[in-house]
């Protein structure tokens, strides 16, 4: 029988935790609470004319590639 009906959450170090499934931020789980965030913009800068070159680099957050198998063991780290 699988833990959480096969919907295990992957935490740090590709270890399965909780029942939240594979999330973008694997160490965070749903707690049923809501949070309100406010953003205040204090000023604006003038537009700048610049050219940027694409560097071709790709950044991946650490431990966000876990995939949990049906027995709540990470089965390879491939969930993104």
Curated annotation (Swiss-Prot):
- Report the protein's function: Metallothioneins have a high content of cysteine residues that bind various heavy metals.
UniProt entry tagged with the keyword Metal-binding: yes
Q: Which GO terms describe its molecular function?
A: metal ion binding
Ordered alphabetically, the record's keywords are: Metal-binding, Metal-thiolate cluster
Q: What is the lineage of its organism?
A: Eukaryota, Viridiplantae, Streptophyta, Embryophyta, Tracheophyta
- A Pfam family found in this protein is Metallothio_2
Q: Which family does this protein fall into?
A: Belongs to the metallothionein superfamily. Type 15 family.
Keyword Metal-binding applies: yes
Specify the protein name: Metallothionein-like protein type 2, MT2-28
Originating organism: Brassica juncea
